[in-house]
Amino acid sequence: MDVTRLLLATLVGFLCFLTVHSHLVFEETLGDDRSLKSNSSINSLDFSSVSIVALNKKSKKISRKEAEKRKRSSKKKASIKKVARPPPPSPCVATRDSCKPPAPACCNPCASCQCRFFGSACTCRVLNPNC
């Protein structure tokens, strides 16, 4: 019975060695100049050359103008989407201020009173910024 255990232990050890050895990455030695040359020639053919060109002042101005136009158009779209909101009630609580239940409503119509820690800390918070 001891012989079978010894054989099983040897077999398990050999299998562990094979699995570890099969997953190791083989390092290239400096003596393999042929493989290095073939790899470098393949790599140089695969990638096209990249040239870095400095932008002149005119192209910078054009890109700034385009950015400003985009910014203006996004502001116009945002202003169009806004709907007239009802005026806030006269006694109201500002955003991020304490709004315990006896306090009046929040000034921002998109804000709501949110309580934490079993209702001990309540603040007016805007949950949906696109309200």
Curated annotation (Swiss-Prot):
Protein's UniProt keywords contain Ribonucleoprotein: no
Signal sequence, renumbered to the chain: 1-22
Gene3D superfamilies to which the protein is assigned, alphabetical: Agouti domain
Domain Agouti: 92-131
The keyword Disulfide bond appears for this protein: yes
Glycosylation site list: N39
A matching Pfam family: Agouti
Disulfide bond residue pairs: C92-C107, C99-C113, C106-C124, C110-C131, C115-C122
Gene Ontology CC annotation, any one: extracellular space
Compartment(s) of residence: Secreted
InterPro entries in the record: Agouti (IPR007733), Agouti_dom (IPR027300), Agouti_dom_sf (IPR036836)
One MF term in the entry's GO annotations: type 4 melanocortin receptor binding
Chain's role: Involved in the regulation of melanogenesis. The binding of ASP to MC1R precludes alpha-MSH initiated signaling and thus blocks production of cAMP, leading to a down-regulation of eumelanogenesis (brown/black pigment) and thus increasing synthesis of pheomelanin (yellow/red pigment).
Entry's free-text remark on domains: The presence of a 'disulfide through disulfide knot' structurally defines this protein as a knottin.
Stated name of the protein: Agouti-signaling protein
Provenance organism: Rattus norvegicus (Rat)
Gene name in the database record: Asip
